Structure formats: C-alpha cells, structure tokens
C-alpha cells in the first residue's frame, strides 16, 4: 500500500510540475503501462487535495468523454470526471492569458447547478432533473499537462480529466423551459462557425451524464452538492485555441457565452 | 453540345433511377468535360421529361450546404435539384429498398414559401419574412452513380441525388425559432446515429433558400409561393438497411419517421 501511495504521489508531482512549468510531461501510461483507472483517480485527488491545502476551493465537477466519438477514440465505454476549482472560472467575455495554458481546446457544454445534494448509487436521469436548480450555458477550456495530448484513459483522469478553465453564460433556464436532448448550439471561433451540436451529443441527454457522475462519485464516498457547478460534457468536438482567438457559443433559449485568449 | 445530347444524358440517368441500378458517372466516358452549367442543362432536361410524364414539382431542394461537403467537393456554392410528387413518403410510412439503389437519409428543415422570392440580392431575412411555415423533414438521397461517387457536374445532372422525402406534419411559423439553433437528432432503431444544429446549413437554413433564390435568378427563375423547399442536411447522411426504423427529432418542430422494408 505504501508503495502504491508513493507511486501515486510521484505521478501526481509529475503532473503538478508540468502545470507549474508549462512543459508537458510524458504520458504516465508510458512510464507505467499498468496504471489503473482507480489509481488515476487517486492521483487526481492527490493534486486536488494539495490545491485545497493551498487555499483553493472545490466549486464543482466536470464530466468528460461523454460523446461516442471521444469514447471510441480512447477505447472506453464510460465517461470520466474532474474537479472544478475556484481559480478556473473566467467571467463571460473574459480573457485567458495564453501563458496560463499549455495546449488549450474549447468545447461548448451545458452546466447544471443543483438545488439539493445527490448521493449515488442508483441515481437516475429523473433524479437529476428533479434536483436541478437551473441550467446555464458554458464554455470549457480543456488543456492537457501531457505532451501533445498523447493521453490514454488513466492519463486524462490523473490530469484532472484535462480540465483547464470554464466560462458560464448569464442566462439560466429551469428544466421545464428547455428540451435538453434537442437543445442546439453553435460554436464559433473568430466569428467563423467551427461546430454545431445538440444536447443529445452528451450520452443522449446531459442530465444522464450528471446521473453517471453522481453514481461514479459514490464509489469514492462523495456526493454531488447543492450549488456546485457541473459541466455535463461537450456538445461538439473541441476546437484548438491560440493567442488572439475569440470563441463564442450560442445556445437555443440560453444566449451566448464567449472567451478570448 | 446540343440540347438533344443533354436530353440523352437525362434519359440515361432516369433509366438508372427507374430500373434501380447504378450507372457509370457521366464524366467517366459519356462526357468527361461536362461543366457545372451543362450539369444544370442536363438536370433541366431531366425535369422536363418528368413534367411531361405528368409528375408535379413539390419544390427545389438544396445540396452541399455543409462546410464539410463544400470543401470535399471544392466548391463555394451549394447545388439544387427538384423534389417531385412521386418521391413523397407519408410521415410514419414505409420505404422499400427495392425501389432504390443505395439510399441514405439525412435530417433537414423544409420551408413552405408564402410569397415569391426573386433574386438577386435576396437575404436570409427576406426569406424568413416570405416563409409561411417551417416543417421538419427527412430526405433520402440516392445517387444513381456507382458507389455514390461523382464529380460536381455529375451530381447536378443527377438532380442532386434526390430520391424520396418524408415531411413532418407539424407546421410552425419561422419567427418562433432561431432556426440556426434548432437541435436535431437522427436515430436508427432508437439509437442516435447523427446530430447537429440548424447552423450546419450555411450558418442558417434560411441562408440556403436565399442562395437558391439568387442562383435561380441568374436563369430568370425564382422561388415560388407554395414551394416546399428542403434547405440542406443538418446531419451527415446514413446508409439505410432493411428493418431500419428512422426517426428525426427537431427541437420545437417535432418528429419525422419512416420504416425501411425490402
């Protein structure tokens, strides 16, 4: 056990260093081909704990690998998740200094804010919809501390599910005001459309992703908390970002959210 | 080339459609230098033959309206063809594979035109103000060419691969929506296979109709009141198989479905 813990600390430090120095690490799975998904979550938790000890606050979760395309790409059949910290939020229309990211990509998503806690297992999509306070549009800036995004499933999980920053829109909707499955989205980069998407791109329904998360977290004895922000998964493929780029996503019924690099 | 030759090519393509068999593309040996303009001349002859046979035009349809397809075909303008009355399938109805060659399905928004729209310089806003209703639709494309492979003039000559259309029956006023943000899923047997939003069509489906009106104006033609026009695919096309139950769901516009039989 102590050996495992030592390994986990060592790998967590590799990722923390990459984040600090801005130089991507080699994939952990190239260093340790046997690294398991569970170990990877422990590496993630190790780094999150370090940040919390430094004074950062956990404000929510993000769900990744929610599209069939992404799951196929990584050869997996379930999503993954990461933690959102208070220093990851950027105001709508705000700017992200390019030196704060390594190799950013932008995705448009729906974010959930719950009005009551959800503790798995056996949480259903219906439970999520009943527990949802409101839904708000979001941009997620994913980033990888692994060189050239050469990630396998344990690599991205250990790296906080490749989280970077997130931006929330200003317009909120209650569950009865929108059809989550069919809610359309257009993602533009520098005023050119790069992608269109729809809610169903995230496991058929974004609320189903949140239910998955509640159940997955219960394996670690964690619940989803009222007031937390939950990024439910990308509605379209991610678009590469570089300095000078402005991204903007328009959502049916939910307005617009944008960010500049 | 003389009109009679365009007519011969049109007959060659109609034979493929009616006999449900692939034909070698026109540019392979019949006429390797067929131009886009000539492609439309062939299409014009094809339309004329069908009208003479007593078929009725339901409306034009737009093709190659997605960025991906336009890049693939190396063009900067979409194409159009015509939907005829015999191509319509009832919502919830059956499509027989034996009636077609290698059909694919895609989801689209259709415009029911309330007033004539005459180019040039027609904008998407003009189109919306002259649109009576929008309705959801599934289009079955079925290129008459071997392996669905063709050049741009070939596909234009082949009436833009038009084969069958299933229109939804819930009519909505266009000003109730941001049509570019209408989300769409296309499912086969209950499993979502393709999805997208209206903006996949030239940024906005009404933009496709505006381009159509402007393209038609070059020939002294216009979009007509009463036309029901397919604005272009929101999703990628899916090859159909026997037994498929195909369902398109459109945010706020409802659902369209059909079943594929032998």
Task: Describe these PLM feature segments.
Chain A
Residues 217:
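Conserved PLP-enzyme active-site core in the AAT-like
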Residues 2-203, 246, 254-261:
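Catalytic-core "active-site belt" of small-molecule-metabolizing enzymes
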């Amino acid at each position: 056990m102590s050996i495992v813990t030592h390994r986990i600390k060592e790998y967590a430090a590799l990722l923390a260093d990459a984040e600090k120095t801005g130089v991507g690490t080699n994939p952990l799975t190239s260093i340790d081909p046997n690294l398991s998904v569970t170990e990877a979550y422990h590496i993630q938790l190790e780094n999150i704990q370090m940040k919390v000890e430094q004074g950062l606050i956990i404000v929510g979760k993000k769900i990744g690998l929610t599209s069939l395309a992404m799951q196929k790409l990584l050869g997996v059949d379930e999503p993954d998740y990461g933690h959102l910290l208070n220093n990851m939020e950027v105001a709508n229309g705000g700017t992200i200094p390019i030196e704060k990211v390594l190799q950013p990509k932008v995705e448009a998503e729906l974010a959930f804010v719950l009005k009551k806690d959800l503790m798995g297992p056996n949480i259903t999509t219906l439970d999520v919809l009943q527990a949802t306070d409101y839904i708000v549009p979001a941009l997620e800036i994913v980033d990888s501390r692994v060189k050239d995004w050469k990630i396998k499933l344990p690599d991205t999980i250990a790296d906080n599910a490749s989280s970077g920053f997130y931006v929330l829109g200003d317009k909120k909707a209650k569950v009865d005001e929108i059809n989550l499955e069919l809610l359309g989205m257009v993602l533009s980069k520098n005023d050119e459309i790069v992608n269109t998407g729809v809610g169903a791109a995230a496991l058929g329904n974004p609320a189903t992703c949140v239910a998955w998360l509640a159940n997955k977290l219960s394996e670690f004895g964690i619940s989803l908390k009222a007031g937390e922000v939950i990024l439910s998964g990308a509605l379209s493929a991610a678009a590469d970002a570089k300095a000078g780029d402005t991204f903007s996503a328009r959502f049916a019924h939910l307005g617009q959210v944008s960010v500049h690099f | 080339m003389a009109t009679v030759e365009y007519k011969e090519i049109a007959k060659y393509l109609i034979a493929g459609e009616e006999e449900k068999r692939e034909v070698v593309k026109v540019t392979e040996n019949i006429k390797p230098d067929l131009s886009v303009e000539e492609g439309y001349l062939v299409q014009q002859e094809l339309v004329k033959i069908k009208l003479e046979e007593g078929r009725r035009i339901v409306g034009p349809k737009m093709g190659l309206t997605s960025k991906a397809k336009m890049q693939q075909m190396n063009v900067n303008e979409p194409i159009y063809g015509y939907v005829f009355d015999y191509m319509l399938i009832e919502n919830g109805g059956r499509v027989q594979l034996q009636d077609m060659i290698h059909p694919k399905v895609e989801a689209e928004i259709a415009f029911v035109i309330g007033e004539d729209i005459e180019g040039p310089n027609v904008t998407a806003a003009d189109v919306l103000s002259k649109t009576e209703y929008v309705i959801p639709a599934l289009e079955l494309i079925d290129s008459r060419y071997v392996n669905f492979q063709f050049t741009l003039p070939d596909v234009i000559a082949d009436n833009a691969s038009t084969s069958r259309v299933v229109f939804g029956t819930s009519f909505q006023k266009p000003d109730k929506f941001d049509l570019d943000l209408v989300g769409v899923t296309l499912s086969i047997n209950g499993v979502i296979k393709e999805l997208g939003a209206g903006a996949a069509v030239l940024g906005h489906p009404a933009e496709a109709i505006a381009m159509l009106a402007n393209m038609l104006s070059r020939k002294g033609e216009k979009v007509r009141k009463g036309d029901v026009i397919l604005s272009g695919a929101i999703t990628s096309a899916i090859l159909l198989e026997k037994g498929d139950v195909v369902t398109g769901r459109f945010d706020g516009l409802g659902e369209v479905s059909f079943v594929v039989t032998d």
